[in-house]
């Protein structure tokens, strides 16, 4: 008989939308990666009657139940005792759990409260899943021969670590994992998802590996997946398809897996021993924030200027006052002067600038909201690029897209210099 897993996330805060249920997303990805069938997810509030109904339904259709949330010390943390009550199992006290909690509290110069005592009560026969970070341990439990139950705290940082350190090895050693799904995600910029899908259409019909397009935050992606017994075997299947895609899509493909535009640009600058400075107006430091979010960016990023006013552009970046008056701050010539100015002032190899209208106010018929100019100044001169970003998704979207366009322009220039 085929076996499947089911996810049950406990917490009224999830139902009310007060907390994003990232644990469900994480488990969906992990179960898919491990090749474990997974057909149902449930979110249930902190109510023992409704939790029992969720358990009863899950037991009818799944053999692996994974609970997140409801393991804390407060009265509305009910997962453990509700499970014990449903399966008519007594709760057993584990002094070693209280000792672990006391030790963790002592490291913070605190002492546990009496409410923490309930976290040491686990169903009879359950195996403790240690929590290396927080106070709430989880369990592995077999209340019935054909049923396995995991419980985890709802705090994502705690849950993710416990999952990787205890649950995954257990599933691998007990026959739940026979062949994993390995995936390679390719990331693209400057090409819509629909256009990308058209270009690689023959590859989308493949069955091993499979190729699937999707988009996130304006960025098109392709996931290449195969089921294999090892990373090496998977690579042999995936690599030729990745090579085909890169040949088809050219510079639109900027990286893979966890790579970002800023990390790719940083790597290129490091390889060349070159430096970067930025001048920002409408993005208000967003470009610099993305660049400095990459570990090691201090080796190539010298700094930036947020020149939000015309006076700042003139005084800090040496933008020509007459050009500001004639063409306005949102113009190609000002973007170029900003990029050249910050490059000169900070003595960097490259200077990037962004000036535009992020909205929702400030637009006009000739310069609508979403109009953005990117300036790029380097050893071979200075140029600018005009973008009209849709204002329908708001100010933050325009600012985010602007920083991505700026990074992509520098990436393309760096690659062009190498060819």
Swiss-Prot record:
Name the SUPFAM superfamilies on file. Answer: CinA-like (SSF142433), Molybdenum cofactor biosynthesis proteins (SSF53218)
This protein is called what?
A: CinA-like protein
Against Pfam families, the record matches this protein to: CinA (PF02464), CinA_KH (PF18146), MoCF_biosynth (PF00994)
Entries under InterPro entries matching the protein: CinA, CinA-like_C, CinA_C, CinA_KH, Competence-induced_CinA, MoaB/Mog-like_dom_sf, MoaB/Mog_dom
* NCBIfam families tied to this protein: cinA_nterm, PncC_domain, PRK00549.1
Which superkingdom is the protein from? Bacteria
Q: Lineage, please?
A: Bacteria, Bacillati, Cyanobacteriota, Cyanophyceae, Acaryochloridales
Q: Which organism is it from?
A: Acaryochloris marina (strain MBIC 11017)
Q: Which family does it belong to?
A: Belongs to the CinA family.
Q: Which SMART domains match?
A: MoCF_biosynth (SM00852)
């Amino acid at each position: 008989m085929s076996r499947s897993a089911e996810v049950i996330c406990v917490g009224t805060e999830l139902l009310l939308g007060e907390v994003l249920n990232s644990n469900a997303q994480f488990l969906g990805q992990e179960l898919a990666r491990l090749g474990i069938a997974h057909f149902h997810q449930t979110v249930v509030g902190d109510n023992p009657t409704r939790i029992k109904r969720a358990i009863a339904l899950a037991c009818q259709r799944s053999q692996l139940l994974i609970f997140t949330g409801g393991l804390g010390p407060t009265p509305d943390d009910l997962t453990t005792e509700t499970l014990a009550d449903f399966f008519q199992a007594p709760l057993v006290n584990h002094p070693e759990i209280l000792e672990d909690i006391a030790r963790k509290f002592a490291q913070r110069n605190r002492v546990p409260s009496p409410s923490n005592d309930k976290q040491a009560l686990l169903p009879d026969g359950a195996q403790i899943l240690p929590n290396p970070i927080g106070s709430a341990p989880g369990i592995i439990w077999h209340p019935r021969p054909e049923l396995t139950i995991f419980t985890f705290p709802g705090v994502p940082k705690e849950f993710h670590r416990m999952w990787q350190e205890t649950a995954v090895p257990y599933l691998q050693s007990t026959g739940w994992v026979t062949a994993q799904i390995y995936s390679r995600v390719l990331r693209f910029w400057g090409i819509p998802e629909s256009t990308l899908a058209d270009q690689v259409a023959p590859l989308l019909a493949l069955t091993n590996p499979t190729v699937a397009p999707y988009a996130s935050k304006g960025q098109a992606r392709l996931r290449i997946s195969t089921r294999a017994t090892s990373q090496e075997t998977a690579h042999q299947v995936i690599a030729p398809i990745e090579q085909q895609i890169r040949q088809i899509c050219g510079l639109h493909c900027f990286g893979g897996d966890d790579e970002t535009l800023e990390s790719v640009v940083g790597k290129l600058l490091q390889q060349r021993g070159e430096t970067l400075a930025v001048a920002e107006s409408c993005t208000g430091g967003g470009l610099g924030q993305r660049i400095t979010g990459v570990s090691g960016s201090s080796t190539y990023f010298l700094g930036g200027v947020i020149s939000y006013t015309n006076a700042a552009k003139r005084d800090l970046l040496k933008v020509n006052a007459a050009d500001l008056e004639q063409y306005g701050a949102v113009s190609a010539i000002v973007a170029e002067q900003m990029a050249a100015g910050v490059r000169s002032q900070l003595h960097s190899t490259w200077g990037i600038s962004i000036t535009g209208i992020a909205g929702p106010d400030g637009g006009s018929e000739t310069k609508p909201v979403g109009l953005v100019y990117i300036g790029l100044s380097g050893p071979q001169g200075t140029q600018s690029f005009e973008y009209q970003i849709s204002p329908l998704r708001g100010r933050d979207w325009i600012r985010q897209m602007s920083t991505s366009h700026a990074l992509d322009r520098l990436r393309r220039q760096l690659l062009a210099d190498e060819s």
